[in-house]
Amino acid sequence: MRIVFVGTPEFAAEILEHLIKNGFNVVGVVTQPDKPRGRGRKVEPTPVKVVAEKHRVPFIQPESINKKEALEFLRSVGPDVIIVASYGKILGEKVLSLPSLGCYNIHPSLLPKYRGASPIQRVLENGEERTGVTIYKMVRELDAGPIALQREISIDPFETFDQLEKRLIELSKEMSIEFLEKLKVGDIELKEQDHSRATYAPMIKKEDLIVDFSKDAESVKNKIRAYDSRPGARAFLGNDEVKLFGVTAIDSSGDEPGLIHYIDREGAWIGTGKGMVKVKYLQLPGKKKLTFWELRNGRLIEEGMKLEGRYES
């Protein structure tokens, strides 16, 4: 079975590496163009490109997978199936109809819930207790195709984005093998999604990262862990936009939204609209993240200061 793999970030790269190491015949790879990344804005290859080069798999990086050059590449490698994971661009009808066995996407949510670009962050932000991975056959509508395989996991109350993403990657790797083995022998049963239950996980905007301390402690906790460690939940300390990481506890007592009540070695208790949250790390502009304890000892932060959740474009 000839496989073309389509994806871009680390999530996809780990799945691709797993397929190749397990002997699957990946005949081609499509990934997004290299882009400037990080503080230095240095152009870096996508993680999927790195894996393709390592294993000498032919790859392309088109601006659009639906243009003539990309379609010619796909036809030349002749896939039986196209596997997509976190590609970041829409596949058109010509691509979807090209492989004889279809195109399948590996999506980190329990579809039809959380269709879209940011399902991991949104399930955490919304305080969901369960999530999972869905492999479905792709159709023109975003994340709306019939389901081939779905697995569910529970979410820890203080689990961060990084931690949950890691577990979902491992689950996706296991499921990709199971799915392709079943596809190889024609043992796939597709189940239509219940479109009336669909919810959406839109692309993250800068304003989504702002912590609103007037909300209750549970909501503030969920906001911080949803963007820990990247790109980081934001607030203002005076005129400085800072990032918050490592929420470790909540308490029903306390108020004064944004007020830093108390700092110890384990973090800072910060007031919310209802209760308090304990946060371990803060990152000042242009600096590495430090514990609140280190910042207090360095006289950069003290009890009684206030964090504000305002948005400045």
Curated annotation (Swiss-Prot):
It catalyses: L-methionyl-tRNA(fMet) + (6R)-10-formyltetrahydrofolate = N-formyl-L-methionyl-tRNA(fMet) + (6S)-5,6,7,8-tetrahydrofolate + H(+). Gene3D superfamilies: 3.40.50.12230. It comes from the Bacteria. One of its GO terms (molecular function) is methionyl-tRNA formyltransferase activity. It is an enzyme of class 2 (transferase). One of its GO terms (cellular component) is cytosol. Keywords: Protein biosynthesis, Transferase. (6S)-5,6,7,8-tetrahydrofolate binds at residues 109-112. InterPro entries: Fmt, Formyl_trans_C, Formyl_transf_N, Formyl_transf_N_sf, Formyl_transferase-like_C_sf, Met-tRNA-FMT_C, Met-tRNA-FMT_N. Its EC number is 2.1.2.9. The keyword rRNA-binding does not apply. The keyword Protein biosynthesis applies. Belongs to the Fmt family. Attaches a formyl group to the free amino group of methionyl-tRNA(fMet). The formyl group appears to play a dual role in the initiator identity of N-formylmethionyl-tRNA by promoting its recognition by IF2 and preventing the misappropriation of this tRNA by the elongation apparatus. This is Methionyl-tRNA formyltransferase. It comes from Thermotoga sp. (strain RQ2). The gene is fmt.
